[in-house]
């Protein structure tokens, strides 16, 4: 077998990994894990069309397996379908419910407003989509054949070829909770071949099966709403993300205290707090945290009077899905529900739907001397409604911009993080905007596992992998994590 990476090799976007089984044989079977969009610096030198092209052969791909529905993991799916892909698309039950919404929004924002074309794509997606419960083994389609032996090779972005006699005849898939966003999963693919005879030695028998684990995006420990991921029992080959492979997050109490302090300072300044956030995952975690702070500060007029505005119709749709799948929430969130609390809804919350209302809110906040918290996409400030807020308020000293998620190189969010503290500027909507706002970053709200979590994911396996492929990270993060893994295996 071999693994080929079509994205998330030199950065954190464009996740797309191909597992080839029996690749030395004419009976090759391939499985695609994610098919995401490139963003930020990883699109440099490419036209929009080039960024979206499916440049690899899809003829032998037997299935697409989706780990979760963030755009950097699913954004190229419409182009995969346009290239002729017509095989099963496997996803968890919650991801299968979210995915059509994500793809529809991505097409509207980045491709076309033609509802006929969009609906045709969604119909085709729904026809191929297969929802799978967590923990359920699903048999994958596979061509039967005998492959010739091969030895381990490793390249930076090319195939990783693993020893593979006597040929695999069965492949099965299981999703396990990843704790990243609703429906997110890491993937276990179990490959097996003809059973060895009783006279075969243990080494020969071991080669008749191989388990490959793809981490997708792993959630951070003690993140709100969703339970932390538990390590698989075993992995022979592991492909793992490394977004924060060189960093550890703040503790939950520290990040909550920092969030509270930032908001209270902004209220005293009568300023606007802008929080760029993904519509799926980060927005819901922030609402959960704000409800907790408001509940703990019942007698504090600051928190009883503050306006918290979610300016994103997509976020509102996804929040409804979070409520629908509350059976996937962690025990803490379920206890709050049992107490009659509503972790994703409270009196101070307003949701903005139409574009007209969006513009009206910006004009209103710009004309009054009143504090407010704005949560809007996109999470890396590469577009979406947050851009209009930044264009209007980034140059005001009373504004606070709060980053709670990873900002990829080449994105507006990374530029604001980098140049904001220096009194620099950015271009938004083709306008040069001086940064006079105060810029904050709270690492503890990241939905990605930190270095400690990533180490434990491997350390807690009973059968540790003999091969690890580190992806989805900047070079520094990948190297730092690799150094830690060398101590384990």
Where are these predicted regions, by residue range?
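A short acidic, amphipathic alpha-helical/loop segment
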Residues: 76-80, 226-227, 289, 385-392, ...
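Short, solvent-exposed amphipathic alpha-helical segments in soluble enzyme
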Residues: 19-22, 189-192, 229-232, 255, ...
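Short, compositionally biased "basic patch" segments
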Residues: 43-47, 224-237, 327-334, 407-434
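Conserved acidic residues
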Residues: 62, 236, 372, 399, ...
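Generic long, charged, amphipathic alpha-helical segments
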Residues: 426-457
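His/Asp/Glu-rich metal-coordinating catalytic cores
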Residues: 1-65, 70, 74, 79-285, ...
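C-terminal structured "cap/appendage" subdomains that terminate the fold
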Residues: 457-485
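Hard-cation-handling environments
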Residues: 260-412, 471
